[in-house]
């Protein structure tokens, strides 16, 4: 598999340092939208999502106007946003099936993909993994 270092426009938007914004980077890369636009939309979604008791978000991000510490990708607002961008959710695993699809160009469809991985999110463009690590 081919890999390309791509921060999705994060540095160009003026942000510095390390952070947990892999969802914003992956969506910006795969959608072709500016990082700052995607980041702001995800931050707004985080800030306005319902604060359910016991619902965990990455690093306690719930209710904060930020996308730099993870996004609750299972929330309806996130799924609606991805649909608005033209993405279609395609599950590759079912409960009890084990891992049958891997991050390999020959096992995934071509085109612009946002890969929801275990604890991480990355973009794949026509078989080329675009990420920062």
Where are these regions (language model features)?
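Conserved active-site-adjacent core of cysteine acyl-enzyme catalytic domains
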Residues: 49-119, 125-128, 132-133
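Active-site nucleophile-adjacent alpha helix/oxyanion-hole segment immediately C-terminal to the catalytic cysteine
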Residues: 1-60, 68, 76, 80, ...
